[in-house]
Amino acid sequence: MAQAQSPLQWLATTVIRGYQLFISPLMGPRCRFNPTCSHYAIEAIKLHGTAKGSWFALKRILRCHPLHPGGSDPVPPKNDRCNK
């Protein structure tokens, strides 16, 4: 069963989705990574929460520039400290 999003997660993913629908098509494909930075951000926020997911997304966006080779860069898995 899917976990419900917090209001902050909903807001963050809605803003990113708005970017995907309205701004990104005007700029064309520019992301060097797979998945794209915006998809990565949504996945990271849903998996890790708003604060940590946004931190992962920011670090990823800062790596997305012409001097970086890009490639496959999935969201890191969530560490479950209770199972260690």
From Swiss-Prot:
The keyword Membrane applies. Belongs to the UPF0161 family. It comes from the Bacteria. Could be involved in insertion of integral membrane proteins into the membrane. InterPro entries: Membr_insert_effic_factor_YidD. Keywords: Cell inner membrane, Cell membrane, Membrane. GO terms for cellular component: plasma membrane. This is Putative membrane protein insertion efficiency factor. It is found in: Cell inner membrane. HAMAP family: UPF0161_YidD. It is a peripheral membrane protein. The keyword Cell membrane applies. SMART domains: Haemolytic (SM01234). Its main location: membrane. Pfam families: YidD.
